[in-house]
Amino acid sequence: MYFREAVSKRIYELCDKYNYIPNKLAEMSAIPPTTLRSTLANNVENPSVYNIYKICKTLKISLKEFFESDLFNFDKFDD
């Protein structure tokens, strides 16, 4: 798995957990919907930490909580 895939999966997990659809999350996070859609489709090579921060702020979670997932286990990443 690539980092961008882990980010996409984590955002989907959090959308499910907090009952957000991606477009609403984008709107509430002040992220252009096209940017979030591209991130979720794995079309963004290096997802922006700033956009992840804005998502975390909207969901009222820390960056630590965002990345505290087995998805971000370095052993699972392809280079």
Q: Each predicted region: which residue ranges?
A:
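Short, basic-rich loop-to-helix N-cap that marks the start of a DNA-contacting helix
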Residues: N43-K57
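Recognition helix of helix-turn-helix/homeodomain-like DNA-binding domains
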Residues: A30-P47
